[in-house]
Amino acid sequence: MKKTLVAAAILSLALTACGGGSDTAAHPPSAKPEAEQSGKLNIYNWSDYVDPETVAAFEKETGIKTRSDYYDSNETLEAKVLTGKSGYDLTAPSIANVGRQIKAGAYQKIDKAQIPHYGNIDKDLLKMMEAVDPGNEYAVPYFWGINTLAINTRQVQKALGTDKLPENEWDLVFNPEYTAKLKSCGISYFDSAIEQIPLALHYLGKDPNSENPEDIKAAVDMMKAVRGDVKRFSSSGYIDDMAAGNLCAAIGYGGDLNIAKTRAEEAENGVEIKVLTPKTGVGVWVDSFMIPRDAQNVANAHRYIDYTLRPEVAAKNGSFVTYAPASRPARDLMDEKYTSDASIFPNKELMEKSFIVSPKSAESAKLGVKLWQGLKAGK
């Protein structure tokens, strides 16, 4: 993806993040599926990525029975869909994996005629996705968000001996001066080379999406220097650990970190979580619904995709999972506490310093995974 496209896309998203509806009808007439299939829909999705009430309402409205399984990393999803015969009708990969999976023949094209609410999708997201899905033929944006970090404010203050955070808040998880102190209360990294290495590259001032082997090695070596201070590697478990006070700093998905914050508040356990948005920038991504090549309930998958693009449904899902929905009209229906939160809807200043987590070549991805596995093993 060209840097000029990246800059234009993320800035445009920031400028329209809290904008009004799309230029198409928010509630077009429903489309009839081309062919009746079974009354089932098998979904493979990220954990904590939908309001259960919207799923129940979909089942009641359509008579379609859904079954959902969950993954916590793009690597896990990719391994499943590339082997074929996954047994799923719908998945939600991230932008960094979409292009490679399309080229591998893992998905079938969508039929936009069966998605009347397609026009509600933020056009800037569609432009961003065209870099990996030319013509937007396979992927339908669902949510977009950021990779950032959160802290347990009381534990961090105690460990640092001050309530003042470093000017570059990424120092908390990458700089030995700070990680050595936070080791006592627990630091968590992503359990994903695809997500973690770009953040380390960005911290070093290098191209976050660099495929230069020396850059990738430099990023991993930097993390090796603090490996002994990292308590765990997790792409979803950090939610409950942060909420319970078992970690004091975690790198994660913005929405998941906000879920941890909400769970701690609901538990009234004295844990105070703050989701940070470092002014030096964060990673930006888009997750899209896609239909596997061997899906058995294709019409039902289209019906569900269309359902999630309804403004009221997208707003309800977005508020529940604390991520920005792809449906622009939905944003007008969300409470200001969500739309004004930079960890959910990043502002212009943050987006100007941020980067899109872009696809990697097979060779670069292989190197990243190899070095990442060595890092986790302490080698």
Please annotate each region the language model reported:
Residues 108-119, 171, 267-283, 292-295:
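Short beta-strand->loop
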Residues 188-276:
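Ligand-binding pocket segment of bilobal, Venus flytrap-like solute-binding proteins
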Residues 287, 292-352:
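Mature extracytoplasmic/periplasmic domains
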Residues 27-101:
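Early extracytoplasmic/lumenal segment of secretory-pathway proteins
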Residues 19-22:
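Bacterial signal peptide processing site
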Residues 348-379:
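Conserved C-terminal helix/tail region of periplasmic/extracytoplasmic solute-binding proteins
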